[in-house]
From Swiss-Prot:
Ligand binding (UDP-N-acetyl-alpha-D-muramoyl-L-alanyl-D-glutamate): 23, 25, 150-151, 177, 183, 185
Gene Ontology cellular-component annotations: cytoplasm
Keyword Secreted among record annotations: no
Family statement: Belongs to the MurCDEF family. MurE subfamily.
Catalytic activity, EC: 6.3.2.13
Described purpose of this protein according to its UniProt entry: Catalyzes the addition of meso-diaminopimelic acid to the nucleotide precursor UDP-N-acetylmuramoyl-L-alanyl-D-glutamate (UMAG) in the biosynthesis of bacterial cell-wall peptidoglycan.
This protein's name: UDP-N-acetylmuramoyl-L-alanyl-D-glutamate--2,6-diaminopimelate ligase
Post-translational events: Carboxylation is probably crucial for Mg(2+) binding and, consequently, for the gamma-phosphate positioning of ATP.
Record's keyword terms, sorted: ATP-binding, Cell cycle, Cell division, Cell shape, Cell wall biogenesis/degradation, Cytoplasm, Ligase, Magnesium, Nucleotide-binding, Peptidoglycan synthesis
GO terms classed as biological process: cell division; cell wall organization; peptidoglycan biosynthetic process; regulation of cell shape
A Pfam family recorded for this sequence: Mur_ligase_M
Length: 487
C-alpha cells in the first residue's frame, strides 16, 4: 500500500507517494524508494544513478562518506546512520506488523531451526496459526519458501511479517541470527518471547571473538517490551544470561539442573524417540516425542518454555509434543529396519557435530559411521576441531567436500586432516556424492550412518556456482542400491 515519503522521512523537501521500498537497484520499479547504504560487498550509493534511471521516485542514502550524487529531479535524502534506521522505516511502511503478533525470537548457535519449527507446529495445534522465518525459509509449517539468510534484511523481515499477518498468522516463530542482531535487521520488531538455545564456536570470521558473538546474541534478552526470556541453563553463557536482571519473566530449562523452571528426569532414549518426566512449578507431566537424541529433548524444553511464556497451560502443551516433527535435514531418519539407519543432519560446527554423534550412539547397535566436510571461505579454525570430534566419537570417519565455495577443496581437507591423531585410518573422498554412496554401501544393517553438514540444502556451492545436490536424495539412492550387495 503506497505511503507518503514524508511519513518515512519527514526531512524530505518534497512529498510524494512511495509504492515500495528496495535496497537493490536491480529490482527498482517506477514509484519505488531506493535506500542506498554501504554493504559488505556493494555500496548502494554507487547504484543511485541506475535506480533513478529505472524510475525510483526518491532515494534515501547514507550521508557519511557520500561522494558526488548524480543530477536528479527526484528527492535525494541524506540520512546519517541510515542502515540502523532501515528496520524502523520498513516497519512504518508495512504498518508495524510485529505489533499485532505473538513474536517469538529464537537465537543460539544450534537449535534455532528446530525450536522455531517445534513452536510453530505446537501453536498451530493449539489453534494459533503461526508463521516461520528462518534458515529453511518463510511461510507456514509444511509450506516454506526458501531464503538465503537465517534472518532476512530489515525490509524483507518487515514485509514478510506483514505478508504472514495478512495470510492469517497470529504468531511468528523467527530464527534470529547473531548477524541479524548485530546488523540491526530486527531492530524495530516487537519481540514478545526470546529463546536462547546455546552458544558455541561459529561465525568468528564475522564477529572476530566469542565475546563479540555472545554480545550480539545477548541483545535479544534486553529487548524493550519483551514479555518472557526462555534460557538454557545447561550452557555456560545461558547461565550468565539468566543471571542478568531484566523486567521480563524468566523461564529456565535444563536436563541436569533441578533448580531450573523446566527440568527433565528419568529421560529414556529409544528407537521410538524420547520419553521423560518433566518437572515444573506448574506440576509434573510426561513428555513424549518421536525425535531422536538428547539435544532434541533440550530443544523440546525450549519450545515448551516459549509456549508457557505465551500463557498456554502445561497439559495442553504436552499433548501436542508427540505430534511434532523435526525439520527437514535435522536428525532426519532414512532407512532403518532391514537396512542401515542413515541420519541426515545440518551439523556444521564442532559443538553440533559432537552433540549429534553423542545423540546417535545409543541408537547404534553396531558401528557409528560419520561423513562430514567443512565449508570454504568460512572459519578455518573449526576444521581440525571437527576432525578430532569425529575421530573420538565415531567408529569410522569419511571426510568429503561440504560447500567449497571459492576455496580449493584440497586446502580445506588439508586443514581438516591436521585434527586427526591417526589420519591413516580416515577415508578422504572429495566428491560428496561418491562419498555418500561409498559409506552407505560399506554399512551393515545394525550400523548408523551420519551424513553431517548440509542437512536440508538442495545445492552444493563450488567456485561460486550452486549445483543441484541433496544429501537426502543421495542417501535414498544409496539405500536403494544397498539391497543389491547385501541381499
Amino acid at each position: 500500500m503506497p505511503m507518503s515519503l514524508n511519513q518515512l522521512f519527514p526531512q524530505a523537501e518534497r512529498d510524494l507517494l512511495i509504492r515500495e521500498l528496495t535496497l537493490d537497484s536491480r529490482g527498482v520499479r517506477p514509484g519505488d524508494l531506493f535506500l542506498a547504504v554501504p554493504g559488505g560487498r556493494q555500496d548502494g550509493r554507487a547504484h543511485i544513478a541506475d535506480a533513478l534511471a529505472k524510475g525510483a521516485a526518491a532515494v534515501a542514502y547514507e550521508a557519511e562518506g557520500a561522494g558526488e550524487l548524480p543530477p536528479s529531479d527526484a528527492p535525494l535524502i541524506a540520512v546519517k546512520g541510515l542502515a540502523a534506521q532501515l528496520s524502523a522505516v520498513a516497519g512504518r511502511f508495512y504498518g508495524e506488523p510485529s505489533r499485532g503478533l505473538d513474536l517469538i525470537g529464537v537465537t543460539g548457535t544450534n537449535g534455532k531451526t528446530s525450536v522455531s519449527q517445534l513452536v510453530a507446529q505446537a501453536l498451530d495445534l493449539l489453534g494459533e496459526r503461526c508463521g516461520i522465518v528462518g534458515t529453511l525459509g518463510t511461510g507456514f509449517y509444511g509450506a516454506l519458501e526458501s531464503g538465503r539468510h537465517t534472518t532476512p534484511d530489515p525490509l524483507a523481515v518487515q514485509a514478510t511479517l506483514a505478508t504472514l499477518k495478512q495470510a492469517g498468522a497470529r504468531a511468528v516463530a523467527m530464527e534470529v541470527s547473531s548477524h541479524g542482531l548485530d546488523q540491526g535487521r530486527v531492530a524495530a520488531l516487537g519481540f514478545d518471547i526470546a529463546v536462547f538455545t546455546n552458544l558455541s564456536r561459529d561465525h568468528l570470521d564475522y564477529h572476530g571473538s566469542m565475546e563479540a558473538y555472545a554480545a550480539a546474541k545477548a541483545k535479544l534478552f534486553a529487548w524493550p517490551g519483551l514479555r518472557c526470556r526462555v534460557i538454557n541453563l545447561d550452557d555456560d553463557f545461558g547461565r550468565r544470561l539468566a543471571g542478568e536482571e531484566q523486567d521480563s519473566e524468566l523461564i529456565t530449562y535444563s536436563l541436569t539442573d533441578s533448580s531450573a523452571f523446566l527440568y527433565c528426569r528419568e529421560a529414556r532414549f529409544g528407537d521410538a524417540g524420547i520419553e521423560a518426566a518433566l518437572v515444573t512449578p506448574h506440576g509434573e507431566g510426561l513428555l513424549r516425542s518421536p525425535l531422536l537424541g538428547r539435544f532434541n529433548l533440550s530443544n523440546l524444553l525450549a519450545a515448551v518454555g516459549a509456549l508457557l511464556g505465551l500463557g498456554y497451560p502445561l497439559g495442553d502443551i504436552l499433548r501436542t509434543l508427540p505430534q511434532l516433527q523435526g525439520p527437514v535435514g535435522r536428525m532426519q531418519r532414512l532407512g532403518g529396519g532391514d537396512k542401515p539407519l542413515v541420519v541426515v543432519d545440518y551439523a556444521h560446527t564442532p559443538d553440533a557435530l559432537e552433540k549429534v554423534l553423542e545423540a546417535l550412539r545409543p541408537h547404534a547397535a553396531a558401528r557409528l559411521l560419520c561423513l562430514f566436510g567443512c565449508g570454504g571461505d568460512r572459519d578455518a579454525g573449526k576444521r581440525p576441531l571437527m576432525a578430532a570430534i569425529a575421530e573420538r566419537l565415531a567408529d569410522e570417519v569419511l571426510v568429503t567436500d561440504d560447500n567449497p565455495r571459492t576455496e580449493a577443496s584440497a586446502a580445506i581437507i588439508a586443514d581438516i586432516r591436521k585434527g586427526f591423531a591417526a589420519a591413516d585410518k580416515v577415508t578422504f573422498l572429495p566428491s560428496r556424492g561418491e562419498a555418500i554412496a561409498h559409506l552407505i554401501a560399506s554399512a551393515a544393517v545394525d550400523d548408523v550412518v551420519l551424513l553431517a553438514g548440509k542437512g536440508h540444502e538442495d545445492y552444493q556451492e563450488i567456485d561460486g556456482v550452486r549445483h543441484p545436490f541433496s544429501d537426502i536424495e543421495q542417501a535414498e539412492r544409496a539405500l536403494a542400491a544397498w539391497e543389491v550387495p547385501h541381499a
